[in-house]
Curated annotation (Swiss-Prot):
It is a single-pass type I membrane protein. This is Maintenance of mitochondrial morphology protein 1. Component of the ERMES/MDM complex, which serves as a molecular tether to connect the endoplasmic reticulum (ER) and mitochondria. Components of this complex are involved in the control of mitochondrial shape and protein biogenesis, and function in nonvesicular lipid trafficking between the ER and mitochondria. Preferentially binds to glycerophospholipids such as phosphatidylcholoine (PC), phosphatidic acid (PA), phosphatidylglycerol (PG), and phosphatidylserine (PS), but not to phosphatidylethanolamine (PE). The gene is MMM1. Residues 435-454 have a biased composition (Basic and acidic residues).
């Protein structure tokens, strides 16, 4: 059924055709299926960025317009010109609002989803932290011993009633027990340190010694005892030549370790001196980095004497063939002056680390040790005499003297200079029967019970 009405504005024809903007006439069917969707798409794109929000009245008008359009298509009848134009105008006003409202709704929905997720995430993190602090840090340890056996048995029964799935998870008290165990070990170590500090303070108080104000001591009595000991060692060395024999035997055992260009070494001179070391300026102080748990004695030592050893050997020239020639060498090295600060203290073996695996002896780890070392600011003066050659001899070559002095100082630093120490195990002072002795009496007369014949 065709419409007999003609639009007043010239856009609608009598036969039900529509005149577009360029003057072309199209049918209503083509307008609804082709031109109208394109027009709506353009309106949708323009309405993404502007337009008021959609109201309920706009939605109702859009629904009425859609229903009227469907009726027009089904009946193939156009409404009166004024009504249809009004519907088109309402459509042009309603669709941009609908599109803009939809886009605004989607934007607000996405913004709200992001804010909601952020808030939920922050709240979940806070809850996890609160749970961890409450149950893992401030909870009581389950490893405490319970004096009531009935409670222990009931707790055992309750634990046995748990399912295997719940037992597979680590209990929060597990971490708490580990933390408490470490805290107990640290507390025990602190108690031991406090006990040592208390013992040191007690000793200083009962011996009337103030580490801060006590003057340094001269150690004259100690010098006398050391002098007697050294004199006894010298007498034994002079009479029996024990030191020379032991040194030669030691060199013979180490002969295989000598380089191929050296012949056997022999001791020709040994001088153990005539004077004695002087110990002075002794002061007791706390050991560094001990926090008052250990005492040590600082003693100045001064030795002005001649300690000499002389050797002879041959330098073998093995080129172009072995034993082509040999060069005799005689060297005498003397220490004429030694000054240093000696550190002496009592300690245990477990307080220090050995420098080599060979020095570890499990039998010597018990008991106390006398530890001594020298400060790095020591002074050691040498006097070296050298003689090279058989007929044409070279005397006192400086290079030989410097080489010998370097090796001696290197040996001394690696063994006795801080931070290296030397340990001497102290014997047990507890009275024992095998250590009991008595003086030997001189017998002038013959033994009793034995007859004397004249």
């Amino acid at each position: 059924m065709e419409s007999n009405y003609t639009g007043m504005d010239g856009n609608w024809a009598l036969n039900g055709t529509v005149s577009v903007g360029n003057g072309t006439l199209i049918s209503v069917d083509e307008f609804l299926h082709n031109a109208l969707p394109m027009h709506l798409q353009a309106l949708f794109q323009d309405g993404n960025s502007q337009g008021p929000l959609l109201t309920m009245e706009d939605l109702e008008k859009a629904i009425e317009f859609k229903r009227a359009s469907q009726e027009l298509v089904n009946d193939n009848v156009l409404a009166p010109d004024g009504l249809f134009v009004e519907l088109l105008r309402q459509q042009e006003k309603t669709l941009p609002r609908l599109i803009s409202a939809t886009s605004n709704t989607q934007g607000s929905f996405s913004s709200w989803s992001f804010a909601q997720g952020l808030i939920v995430g922050q709240v979940s993190v806070v809850l996890v932290l609160i749970f961890f602090i409450k149950f893992f840090i401030f909870s009581d340890s389950s490893t405490k011993t319970n004096p009531n056996p009935a409670k222990n048995s009931s707790s055992t029964n309750s634990l046995s009633g748990l399912s295997s799935e719940s037992r597979s998870f680590i209990s929060p008290h597990f971490f708490t027990s580990i933390m408490n165990r470490k805290g107990n070990e640290q507390a025990e170590s602190n108690d031991d340190e406090n006990e040592r500090s208390r013992q040191i303070d007690d000793i200083l108080e009962k011996t009337y010694y103030n580490v801060d104000t006590h003057p340094a001591e001269s150690l004259d009595w100690f010098n006398v005892l050391i002098g007697q000991t050294i004199q006894q060692l010298r007498e034994e060395a002079w009479k029996k030549d024990n030191i020379v024999y032991s040194l030669n035997a030691f060199i013979e055992r180490k002969a295989q370790e000598l380089p191929s260009y050296l012949d056997s070494i022999k001791i020709t001179e040994l001088d153990i001196g005539h004077d004695f070391p002087i110990f002075s300026n002794c002061r007791i102080q706390y050991s560094p980095n001990s926090n008052g748990r250990k005492l040590e004695a600082k003693i100045d030592i001064d030795l002005n004497d001649r300690l000499a050893v002389g050797i002879e050997t041959r330098l073998l020239l093995n080129y172009p063939k072995p034993l082509t020639a040999s060069l005799p060498i005689n060297v005498t090295v003397s220490i004429i002056r030694f000054q240093a600060c000696l550190t002496v203290s009592l300690t245990k073996a477990e307080e220090f680390v050995p420098t080599s695996p060979e020095s570890v002896d499990e039998d010597d780890n018990d008991g106390y040790f006398l530890m001594f070392s020298f400060a790095p600011e020591y002074r050691m003066e040498f006097e070296t005499q050298s003689l090279i050659g058989a007929r044409s001899k070279l005397e006192n070559i400086p290079k030989i003297g410097s080489l010998v002095e370097y090796q001696i100082k290197k040996w001394f630093v690696e063994r006795c200079v801080e931070p290296r120490f030397q340990f001497i195990k102290l014997p047990s002072v507890w009275p024992r029967s095998k250590n009991t002795r008595e003086g030997k009496a001189d017998v002038d007369e013959s033994e009793p019970g034995r007859e004397t014949h004249y």
